[in-house]
């Protein structure tokens, strides 16, 4: 007999001993759509990167220069937004549906205000950013344009991320997955016409003139921005029109409450700080890589895209772990929270171990998807094979952190990530890059990910992450 997350939460609140097969079924029900979403989204990102990569290594390097800055800004905003979805999961687990809808409404106001402010900041700094990062003069114009256009779409990016996470908190992983896939398909379509100029193509033996704007890197940014605008609007439309515990049409207040603000500060501030710490370290790493030449910059950027083949499953399971643990904590069932955490973490490690093998075996072919530059392919394949050994422990850190965040332990996650990234990866990269180049940077990354996974497993085993309890 199948069981939904809502039914499982009701049984947890009643104190029932839920069989392991039911918890595993719910975990798989939430994980599989999220994993499939990550697979499709990653495939679309591969196509997206390949469309830019075939313009040339300089185009790829232009985006690679500012990619860590997009991670920094987006990561901080995503951390704050995640605090709202964690509250929703715990309130639904406690059967406090009106409180959950109140949090949703407050998140909408937050997204609008903070998203517009962040967009203005990003556009305002885009002119100077590539220079601050040490980019070659020839790369700066395209890098600035890409960052400015991407920043302008931040309100929609925040909306899609926040509302999709809230839908998953209700046990619906399919709808946000479909929205994400549709958004990625739109991204490819928009990029096809915006990146390339008008050209002749042969389709089924017929010569056709295909229209295009030929905007190159700025066209890639605009295509992504337009797709995100559609995705964010669709996610909001689902919450407006579809019946369910989070339906905005149901009774609820639009007032900002002290409890919600307290919880956002308690959970969201450490999450934002964590993302800032990780992403700012990435900015410094890009600064290190930018001094290694255009080939290294392109190989590093495309290598990161190729590696996402491995960790996409981990992040899919992390989404499920956050919702499951959040509802278990809300239902005051520490035993179920632990079960979900270990079950999901084991799934993440196992799947990422398998994809790590694939990454090692097919590294040259993966790099060949993105670029035809032989030097970039050779260097990228070499560093990917180093990274493949870290994938199981990377999976442990991804899913375990999602479990802890679902319980409200964002401070613990922040400290572990800070120590690992700044104490291990950056230190080793500074020491190894001058002698070993990009290979040294990725050796540092591999060592750090293994360390991070061990730290998260140790904290999860000690159980102190559950002491945070349910939110106010």
How should these model regions be labeled?
Residues 38-39, 75, 115, 119, ...:
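Residue-level hotspots within the lipid-embedded alpha helices of multi-pass solute transporters
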Residues 29-48, 149, 160, 227-231, ...:
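Transmembrane helical elements of multi-pass membrane transporters/channels
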Residues 1-34, 88-155, 186, 202-269, ...:
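Short alpha-helical transmembrane segments in multi-pass integral membrane proteins
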Residues 18-50, 54-55, 68-87, 112-119, ...:
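N-terminal transmembrane alpha-helices
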Residues 60-120, 157-176, 286, 299-363, ...:
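Small-residue-rich hydrophobic transmembrane alpha-helices
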Residues 46-50, 128, 162-166, 188-193, ...:
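Alpha-helical transmembrane segments of multipass membrane proteins
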Residues 51-71, 137-145, 217-222, 259-267, ...:
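Interfacial/gating helices of multi-pass transporter permease domains
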Residues 39-61, 130-137, 193-198, 207, ...:
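Helix-terminus/linker motif at the lipid-water interface of multi-pass membrane proteins
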């Amino acid at each position: 007999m199948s069981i939904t997350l809502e039914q499982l939460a009701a049984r947890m609140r009643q104190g029932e001993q839920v069989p392991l097969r039911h918890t595993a079924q719910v975990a798989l029900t939430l994980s599989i759509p999220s994993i499939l979403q990550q697979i499709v989204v990653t495939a679309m990102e591969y196509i997206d990167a390949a469309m830019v990569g075939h313009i040339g290594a300089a185009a790829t390097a232009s985006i690679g220069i500012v990619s860590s800055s997009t991670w920094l800004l987006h990561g901080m905003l995503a951390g704050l937004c995640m605090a709202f979805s964690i509250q929703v999961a715990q309130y639904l687990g406690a059967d406090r549906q009106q409180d959950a809808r109140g949090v949703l409404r407050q998140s909408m106001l937050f997204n609008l205000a903070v998203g517009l402010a962040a967009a203005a900041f990003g556009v305002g700094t885009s002119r100077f950013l590539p220079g601050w990062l040490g980019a070659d003069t020839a790369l700066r114009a395209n890098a600035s344009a890409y960052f400015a256009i991407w920043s302008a779409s931040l309100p929609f990016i925040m909306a899609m991320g926040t509302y999709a996470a809230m839908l998953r908190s209700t046990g619906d992983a399919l709808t946000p997955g479909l929205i994400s896939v549709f958004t990625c398909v739109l991204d490819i379509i928009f990029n096809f016409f915006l990146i390339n100029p008008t050209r002749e193509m042969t389709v089924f033996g017929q010569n056709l003139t295909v229209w295009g704007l030929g905007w190159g890197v700025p066209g890639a940014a605009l295509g992504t921005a337009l797709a995100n605008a559609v995705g964010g609007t669709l996610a909001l439309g689902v919450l407006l029109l579809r019946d369910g515990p989070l339906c905005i049409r149901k009774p609820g207040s639009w007032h900002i409450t002290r409890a919600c603000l307290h919880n956002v500060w308690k959970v969201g501030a450490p999450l934002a700080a964590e993302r800032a710490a990780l992403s700012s370290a990435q900015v410094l790493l890009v600064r290190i890589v930018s001094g290694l030449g255009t080939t290294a910059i392109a190989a590093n950027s495309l290598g990161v895209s190729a590696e996402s083949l491995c960790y996409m499953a981990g992040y899919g399971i992390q989404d499920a772990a956050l919702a499951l643990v959040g509802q278990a904590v809300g239902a005051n069932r520490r035993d179920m929270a632990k079960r979900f955490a270990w079950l999901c973490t084991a799934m993440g490690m196992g799947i990422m171990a398998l994809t790590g093998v694939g990454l090692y075996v097919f590294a040259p072919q993966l790099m060949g998807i993105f670029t035809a530059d032989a030097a970039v392919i050779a260097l990228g394949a070499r560093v990917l094979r180093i990274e493949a050994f870290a994938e199981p422990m990377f999976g442990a850190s991804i899913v375990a952190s999602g479990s802890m965040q679902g319980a409200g332990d964002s401070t613990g996650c922040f400290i572990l990530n800070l120590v690992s990234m700044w104490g291990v990866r950056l230190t080793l990269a500074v020491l190894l890059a001058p002698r070993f180049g990009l290979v040294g940077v990725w050796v540092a990354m591999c060592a750090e990910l293994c360390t991070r996974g061990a730290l998260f497993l140790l904290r999860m085993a000690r159980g102190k992450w559950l002491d945070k309890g349910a939110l106010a």
